């Protein structure tokens, strides 16, 4: 489990300074039906003949690389930065993360 702060002060190229950024997880958008590859695949699939391309079934990885989306609060510029592989990601306030670190050091925790 990875704990990530909801806001982070980091460099913004457009503002040319360190500003506050809102951090969220990047989600894949809906695929376009007008893309050339999608149109080609749909034409190939139509009509008689069944499945034309192999369906991939050998899954090697158990996790995906998480991508974080940074939104600048002043100029609204967005950028996406990947981090390491992890099963779960939790967005917390900085104070909650600091409390969690202090509690881990406590032997009674």
Curated annotation (Swiss-Prot):
Transmembrane segments: none annotated. Keywords: Cytoplasm, Ribonucleoprotein, Ribosomal protein. It is found in: Cytoplasm. Residues 23-53 are annotated as: Disordered. GO terms for biological process: translation. Disulfide bonds: none annotated. InterPro entries: Ribosomal_eL44, Ribosomal_LSU_eL42, Ribosomal_zn-bd. PANTHER family: 60S RIBOSOMAL PROTEIN L36A/L44. One of its GO terms (cellular component) is cytoplasm. Coiled coil: none annotated. Belongs to the eukaryotic ribosomal protein eL42 family. Residues 28-43 have a biased composition (Basic and acidic residues). One of its GO terms (molecular function) is structural constituent of ribosome. This is Large ribosomal subunit protein eL42. Its main location: cytoplasm.
């Amino acid at each position: 489990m990875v704990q990530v702060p909801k806001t982070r002060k980091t460099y913004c190229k457009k503002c040319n300074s360190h500003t506050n950024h809102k951090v969220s997880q990047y989600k894949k958008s809906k695929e376009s039906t007008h893309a050339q590859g999608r149109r080609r695949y749909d034409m190939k699939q139509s009509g008689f003949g069944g499945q034309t391309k192999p369906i991939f079934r050998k899954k090697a990885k158990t996790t995906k690389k998480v991508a974080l989306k940074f939104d600048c609060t002043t100029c609204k510029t967005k950028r996406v930065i990947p981090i390491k592989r992890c099963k779960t990601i939790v967005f917390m306030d900085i104070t909650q993360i600091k409390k969690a670190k202090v509690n881990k050091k406590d032997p009674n925790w």
